[in-house]
Amino acid sequence: MAKKSWIAREEKRERLYEKHKEERRRLKEEEKWVELQKLPRDSSPVRQNNRCELCGRQRGYLRKFGVCRICFRELALEGKIPGIRKASW
């Protein structure tokens, strides 16, 4: 389980991104780079990281399912993800 502070930090970045999204787009179109640099650093979409919905893990994230590899395996073995079976050959 990820630390609560890390998860809260990611949520804060998401809120800042949503708040400054239109302003950032407008400044890019007008090519006002100095004003763009004055926006908060965390309002940039590149600063956001994907996190597992269940445990908050950042690495090993599977975009298609929204969970990390460990939680994915647990859910798949429990049969909670439709259409996913353990490979056998």
Swiss-Prot record:
<keyword id="KW-0699">rRNA-binding</keyword>
<feature type="binding site">
    <location>
        <position position="55"/>
    </location>
    <ligand>
        <name>Zn(2+)</name>
    </ligand>
</feature>
<keyword id="KW-0862">Zinc</keyword>
<dbReference type="InterPro" id="IPR043140">
    <property type="entry name" value="Ribosomal_uS14_sf"/>
</dbReference>
<feature type="binding site">
    <location>
        <position position="52"/>
    </location>
    <ligand>
        <name>Zn(2+)</name>
    </ligand>
</feature>
<dbReference type="GO" id="GO:0006412">
    <property type="term" value="P:translation"/>
</dbReference>
<keyword id="KW-0694">RNA-binding</keyword>
<dbReference type="InterPro" id="IPR023053">
    <property type="entry name" value="Ribosomal_uS14_bact"/>
</dbReference>
<dbReference type="GO" id="GO:0019843">
    <property type="term" value="F:rRNA binding"/>
</dbReference>
<comment type="subunit">
    <text>Part of the 30S ribosomal subunit. Contacts proteins S3 and S10.</text>
</comment>
<feature type="binding site">
    <location>
        <position position="68"/>
    </location>
    <ligand>
        <name>Zn(2+)</name>
    </ligand>
</feature>
<dbReference type="GO" id="GO:0005737">
    <property type="term" value="C:cytoplasm"/>
</dbReference>
<keyword id="KW-0689">Ribosomal protein</keyword>
<dbReference type="Pfam" id="PF00253">
    <property type="entry name" value="Ribosomal_S14"/>
</dbReference>
<dbReference type="GO" id="GO:0003735">
    <property type="term" value="F:structural constituent of ribosome"/>
</dbReference>
<dbReference type="GO" id="GO:0015935">
    <property type="term" value="C:small ribosomal subunit"/>
</dbReference>
<dbReference type="InterPro" id="IPR018271">
    <property type="entry name" value="Ribosomal_uS14_CS"/>
</dbReference>
<protein>
    <recommendedName>
        <fullName>Small ribosomal subunit protein uS14</fullName>
    </recommendedName>
</protein>
<dbReference type="InterPro" id="IPR023036">
    <property type="entry name" value="Ribosomal_uS14_bac/plastid"/>
</dbReference>
<dbReference type="InterPro" id="IPR001209">
    <property type="entry name" value="Ribosomal_uS14"/>
</dbReference>
<dbReference type="GO" id="GO:0046872">
    <property type="term" value="F:metal ion binding"/>
</dbReference>
<feature type="binding site">
    <location>
        <position position="71"/>
    </location>
    <ligand>
        <name>Zn(2+)</name>
    </ligand>
</feature>
<comment type="similarity">
    <text>Belongs to the universal ribosomal protein uS14 family.</text>
</comment>
<keyword id="KW-0479">Metal-binding</keyword>
<comment type="function">
    <text>Binds 16S rRNA, required for the assembly of 30S particles and may also be responsible for determining the conformation of the 16S rRNA at the A site.</text>
</comment>
<keyword id="KW-0687">Ribonucleoprotein</keyword>
